[in-house]
């Protein structure tokens, strides 16, 4: 059998590791101070590496995993031994990345990363809330400054709103005026309807006409003294004075449209004659 | 003097019966006629000289005037405040025998035709005069005084003088026809007076538009009363708010110029048909004038100054014209002044019977007085 057919897999692995070393950026300078630590590290790494390789040795996919996980380590240094086989092997192992089964999953790492980002955003938001609002409009709880400014501008310039405001003000003003003057009106005035007011006006005119001014001289008056004395004692003139002052007025019928009696507006008593209803009938067969 | 008091009612009109020498009818209203019932009183003077009530009729509204039926001794017509006229029979109780309803407002006067005795008329605040027959419910004819522009017709000088006398000026009740009368000489002549200060003379034989002649009688103030002289067919008297009584000769009314102002001579009255004037006949407005049935030159007036006066028309001596006026006389021709009433006097009528000079008057004090003004 040719010798090529007798090469062991370990040798092949060693060869691949050598090539990686040449291509990587690992420094080749030796460090004396860390020798002891490096030794311990190598011992630990050796046991892990062996277990790993032995565990995945029968699977060719394991080789790809090793290649994928091979990452440079900051603690990796070149050994002082310059033996071709051992020196090449040890650094290669030290530079490999170990896939820890207890490590957090990538999904967890992603979620945690988002969480940290959120925390940073919250922290920055506390310091610059407006800036944040300007950047992320969708997350704002209130409209941006520009929008607020526009709303304020609209309130000033919108004629509909101004009109409504004025209308409301006028309504309020009327209510105040009504409340202010209504008690006085109720105290000082008696509520008369049109007919009652008309009668009061006529009575006032009659009193003025039939009563001479007190300051007028007897010679200038057109009425004789006897007529004046009669007028002063006249029951009709006295009734007119009472109607003029509002003490007496028309008493409306039940229908509210006509009046048939006079009454005192002070105490409600009847003044003058009581009205008696008369049927609108005739004696028949008289003219025939 | 005889007296009768209508308790609770004010007298508005009184008239002697044309058939019985001792019977009178009085139209009255409660509460001075302002509001409330009316009442028609049928009174008689008994042998001992007392006035007694023989019948009465209570009405739904106030009564403003009345007229005896000249062809039936027991029937009396009344003018009512609700716009109706009612015919009562004094031998019946409570209700009328006929109701005539066409006027739209208060009926202020009614008058029976003395010539044909078959018709009567009414005048109303609605501005119309209606002629009726007692046998028909509907009126025979409606007369309306032609409306005139008062401000253009009023004599400016008289208006100024009247204003100085504290008059209220132009009447506000222009359309109101306060009184209308048939002529006692011609059954076709009707005289009326209105709140627009005009008197209107109607000849009902003429077609509408040509049947009336209007003349200004009280210088723009309300004309409240008018009456035909019983002996001189062409003489009428009017009274109004200006406290004056004026006497007119309707023969001098010019049909074309009766409503215009003529001032050919300074101081002359603005209407040449006025033949006499009694200025300031009363202290207040004159509500009633009525000529004597016994003398051609004597008339009576009733006024708001609570008095009744008897006057002699000095423009006529009973036989011929004297061309004098009462304004030139010291007493203004006053014969008698009756002062017993204590309220406005609205109704007055001469007695046709007994010694000439007996009159009856009624006022808002509810009293009816029968007295003699000619001694």
UniProtKB/Swiss-Prot annotation, chain A:
InterPro entries: PEX18_PEX21_C. Monoubiquitinated at Cys-5; acts as a signal for PEX21 extraction and is required for proper export from peroxisomes and recycling. Receptor that mediates peroxisomal import of proteins containing a C-terminal PTS2-type peroxisomal targeting signal via its interaction with PEX7. Interaction with PEX7 only takes place when PEX7 is associated with cargo proteins containing a PTS2 peroxisomal targeting signal. PEX7 along with PTS2-containing cargo proteins are then translocated through the PEX13-PEX14 docking complex together with PEX21. Acts as an activator of the seryl-tRNA synthetase SES1 by increasing its binding to tRNA. The keyword Lipid metabolism does not apply. It is found in: Cytoplasm, Cytosol; Peroxisome. Its main location: cytoplasm. One of its GO terms (biological process) is protein import into peroxisome matrix. Changing residue 202 to D: Does not affect formation of a ternary complex composed of PEX21 and PEX7 along with PTS2-containing cargo proteins. GO terms for molecular function: protein carrier chaperone. Keywords: Cytoplasm, Peroxisome, Protein transport, Thioester bond, Transport, Ubl conjugation. The keyword Isomerase does not apply. There is a cross-link at residue 5 (Glycyl cysteine thioester (Cys-Gly) (interchain with G-Cter in ubiquitin)). This is Peroxisomal protein PEX21. The gene is PEX21. GO terms for cellular component: cargo receptor complex; cytoplasm; cytosol; peroxisomal membrane; peroxisome. Changing residue 234 to F: Abolished interaction with PEX7.
Swiss-Prot record, chain B:
One of its GO terms (biological process) is protein import into peroxisome matrix, docking. Gene3D superfamilies: YVTN repeat-like/Quinoprotein amine dehydrogenase. One of its GO terms (molecular function) is peroxisome matrix targeting signal-2 binding. It holds the Pfam family WD40. It is found in: Cytoplasm, Cytosol; Peroxisome matrix. InterPro entries: G-protein_beta_WD-40_rep (IPR020472), PEX7 (IPR044536), WD40/YVTN_repeat-like_dom_sf (IPR015943), WD40_repeat_CS (IPR019775), WD40_repeat_dom_sf (IPR036322), WD40_rpt (IPR001680). Keywords: Cytoplasm, Peroxisome, Protein transport, Repeat, Transport, WD repeat. The keyword Repeat applies. GO terms for cellular component: cargo receptor complex; cytoplasm; cytosol; peroxisomal matrix; peroxisomal membrane; peroxisome. WD repeats lie at residues 58-89, 102-133, 172-203, 218-249, 281-312, 340-372. Belongs to the WD repeat peroxin-7 family. Receptor required for the peroxisomal import of proteins containing a C-terminal PTS2-type peroxisomal targeting signal, such as 3-oxoacyl-CoA thiolase. Specifically binds to cargo proteins containing a PTS2 peroxisomal targeting signal in the cytosol. Cargo protein-binding triggers interaction with PEX21 and formation of a ternary complex composed of PEX21 and PEX7 along with PTS2-containing cargo proteins, which is tranlocated into peroxisomes by passing through the PEX13-PEX14 docking complex. Present with 589 molecules/cell in log phase SD medium. Interacts with PEX21. This is Peroxisomal targeting signal 2 receptor. It comes from Saccharomyces cerevisiae (strain ATCC 204508 / S288c) (Baker's yeast).
